Amino acid sequence: MTGPDEIAELVASLTREVADFPEPGVQFKDLTPLFADADGLSRVTDALAQAASGATLIAGIDARGFLLGAAVAIRLGVGVLAVRKAGKLPPPVHAQTYQLEYGTAALEIPADGVELAGRRVAIVDDVLATGGTLAATARLLTTAGADVISAGVVLELSDLGGRAAVAPLPLTALRAI
């Protein structure tokens, strides 16, 4: 078993830092090297699966949450639900809008074909920044009848206030900076 400090060090060692992306002054954290490393991906999957213990369904947020969500779901022996950006799913859908810095966005899940009532759902994503997307995902799933039990992310950008935005939802971040 890998402890939290070892996982945080692993994430740090396999995170590529990109200066001034996507705009000047931003220090982008690229997790692609972590996902491309078999041992790194496996250990991160194990840690996120432990955080999602008790879930009967994993919800992965568009887009890199899909990768992690599927891996965690397989590890736990449960299904995975892709939470999509608006316009990517055929109708009917459940939708949830949320605020962006300049405007709004929406997330969607199928309204037919997946019964969420009574399902214990854990949300998985790559990075927690402001928390807007994760909080909207939790609202969307709850509105559709799910019992959202937890959220897990690989990397939390602590200064951006995401943890407070998703409170009181239990949140596990494998590395916080």
From Swiss-Prot:
Cell compartment(s), UniProt: Cytoplasm
GO terms, molecular function:
adenine binding; adenine phosphoribosyltransferase activity; AMP binding
Known InterPro entries for this protein?
Ade_phspho_trans, PRibTrfase_dom, PRTase-like, UPRTase/APRTase
Q: What is its main location?
A: cytoplasm
Which SUPFAM superfamilies does this UniProt record tie to the protein?
PRTase-like (SSF53271)
GO terms, biological process: adenine salvage; AMP salvage; purine ribonucleoside salvage
Could you tell me the EC number(s) of this protein?
2.4.2.7
UniProt keyword annotation of Iron present: no
Alphabetically sorted, this entry's keywords are: Cytoplasm, Glycosyltransferase, Purine salvage, Transferase
The pathway entry for this protein reads as: Purine metabolism; AMP biosynthesis via salvage pathway; AMP from adenine: step 1/1
Q: Please, which domain of life does this record's source organism belong to?
A: Bacteria
The reaction(s) annotated as catalysed by this protein in its Swiss-Prot or TrEMBL entry are: AMP + diphosphate = 5-phospho-alpha-D-ribose 1-diphosphate + adenine
UniProt enzyme class: transferase
Name the family the entry cites. Answer: Belongs to the purine/pyrimidine phosphoribosyltransferase family.
Q: What does this protein do?
A: Catalyzes a salvage reaction resulting in the formation of AMP, that is energically less costly than de novo synthesis.
Q: Which PANTHER family match?
A: ADENINE PHOSPHORIBOSYLTRANSFERASE
Q: What is this protein called?
A: Adenine phosphoribosyltransferase
What is the scientific name of the source organism? Mycobacteroides abscessus (strain ATCC 19977 / DSM 44196 / CCUG 20993 / CIP 104536 / JCM 13569 / NCTC 13031 / TMC 1543 / L948) (Mycobacterium abscessus)
